[in-house]
């Protein structure tokens, strides 16, 4: 229609509905190796994009081990890099070494803010596709490294360079049952509607996560074929003494 839907208005995408039916009927095979894959390839070439049918064909989902830290008796779990869930864990590692703030709300907030800023500084320097990282997750989450970073936090705010606020387009879902099973699920096209490009007759909106790469050839997160970019989505879990407390997550790019 050329306009966004209004409040309460039902939005329909028959093209996307047909695409989802095709994906369901083929077990996603068509998306990665069939007609849909070819349409994505053709569309990408037309607009000088970098997605090719070979990229889709070579993709397969990965089963990864989550990473965690213990924060005051609770195990906090996140996905490993290339996502930045490790930022939350690094900040918690820094914070848990502080004594009580004795009711000083300003000091309490100050320490949290500074810990997150320090964690992000490391994140932007070292995080990437784990196959390319030259600093290990274990090193970043070590107690010794957290102690080094903690020493940098005093009564005054650190002064990082000003950045550009980011806007996100993310959906998060959490579910749990009475038997301890938990699901922490997040999906994002990144900024706004992603790239703003929809593959004709499919309803598929292409994301723009590639903009999280850097063009600095010497940086660990430099763009490369088959490489995963630094990622902002961080679905998590909370457990205590091996027992589930609950899933958690939030929308909002770097504010997560």
Where in this protein do the model-derived segments appear?
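Internal maturation/activation junctions in enzymes
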Residues: 99-189, 201-202, 209
